[in-house]
Amino acid sequence: MALPSPASEEAEGPCQEANQEYQEPVCSPVPEPEPEPEPEPEPEPEPVPVPPPEPQPEPEPQPLPDPAPLPVLGFEAEPVQEPEPTPTVETRGTARGFQPPEGGFGWIVVFAATWCNGSIFGIHNSVGILYSMLLEEEKEKNRQVEFQAAWVGALAMGMIFFCSPIVSIFTDRLGCRITATTGAAVAFIGLHTSSFTSSLSLRYFTYGILFGCGCSFAFQPSLVILGHYFQRRLGLANGVVSAGSSIFSMSFPFLIKMLGDRIKLAQTFQVLSTFMFVLTLLSLTYRPLLPSSQDTPSKRGAHTLRQRFLVQFRKYFNMRVFRQRTYRIWAFGIAAAALGYFVPYVHLMKYVEDKFKEIKETWVLLVCIGATSGLGRLVSGHISDSIPGLKKIYLQVLSFLLLGLMSMMIPLCRDFGGLIVVCLFLGLCDGFFITIMAPIAFELVGPMQASQAIGYLLGMMALPMIAGPPIAGLLRNCFGNYHVAFYFAGVPPIIGAVILFFVPLMHQRMFKKEQRESSKDKMLSHDPDPNGELLPGSPTPEEPI
């Protein structure tokens, strides 16, 4: 019998009471408890935007140092020298990609350079008349004065070439404008002070040294500045400039002869100095376009005395042009020819006065030289533009051969007409030789080193140019006439022509050899230099100086 649970007893209590009252018991359902409402979730706070962290630059990987070489038994390991950093040039532009304007303001520069070449070489090519005037003044003191008087004009002409390496340094460091203006001012002072002295020894300094050095500083920048404004028509520009010298040469003999007859030698120097004064003003138009070199960090970082000396030496004397064999041969050939080049200009007038005493217009010979020189410079300018590469040198070979032969023909002329024909050929050869000198230098060493290449060339010509006329004067004193002197003057140009003949052949041979080597070693070829290119015969790329 199961016992009732306490819950059942509680349920029976109210029912029994209802039965006692005779009422039907009502059982109400127990209400279920209402579920408590779930609390609404609180809204989550909006996240505050956090700025993303700045990206940190990744450190560049440092190159591992080269392992030190293992010492070999019996030898000490030499310290490894780190290569010097590549020098940088702070300029307005680089030579690579530079395009000359080929005109425009360049034609004003051409006019200034024309006046420069015309006034300088117009005076120097008329030195034969000045030489005769000097002899007239000095004959009263010394009968055998030809040797001493010849030094005046020879020094002036020789100093133009002797100072050329120094002028190249000033041109590279200071620019064409400052160098040319300073030189023209010095030339003006030299000519003007020559009028205040009658001493031959003092005129060695005033005319020979001062005037000659000033002309050198004024002349060479006129050759270099044309390469800044012309490239495709550089030969034509050089021809126009050189032709200006011929126009002046045609007028200067007549002018100097007229001044000498009327106002004598001293006042003639004063009149000629005005041309140098005008040149000083015109030289201000030489605005350079190509960059000039400056000091590099590697040069400033030199520590040892030897390094500082080498830095300064390389800074002022760029010897890289002599690494090219073709340039060395070319410069030596022209220097050899220069020994007899200037002899006819100095002694021709005196020779004609001695042999053809009835002829008064001896200056006509210098006019003929100037006229055909201008024609030769114009023609050679056009011809050189059409001749590719170093084949232009063959024009110099031909001109030197004819120049030597014509010098030897002077004593063989029996009449004045024959001398006129000889002088016409002399001027033509002079025009061809002078005009193509700068374009050949650009072809040999490139535009960045052309300035010093021309400077060293003219410097090598200085000694034979100075020595030639005095040697001819000494021969005249020894033999009593100019025959041997002019025969002597014709030999060096012929020798120079033979030397120059081999330069294009050697250049072509070296170019083919380098092409064969470059085709084999393409993977090991040098990177292109930003300032130049590798020239045939040069071990290093062309660089600014």
UniProtKB/Swiss-Prot annotation:
Chain ranges on the Extracellular side, renumbered to this chain: 124-149, 203-204, 257-264, 350-362, 414-415, 475-483
Biased composition (Basic and acidic residues): 514-529
Modification sites for Phosphothreonine: T540
InterPro entries given in the database record: MFS (IPR011701), MFS_dom (IPR020846), MFS_trans_sf (IPR036259), Proton-linked_MCT (IPR050327)
Biased composition (Pro residues): 46-70
Transmembrane feature ranges: 103-123, 150-170, 182-202, 205-225, 236-256, 265-285, 329-349, 363-383, 393-413, 416-436, 454-474, 484-504
Membrane topology per record: Multi-pass membrane protein
Family, per entry: Belongs to the major facilitator superfamily. Monocarboxylate porter (TC 2.A.1.13) family.
Subunit: Monomer. Homodimer. Homooligomer.
Protein name: Monocarboxylate transporter 8
Natural source organism: Rattus norvegicus
Source organism phylogeny: Eukaryota, Metazoa, Chordata, Craniata, Vertebrata
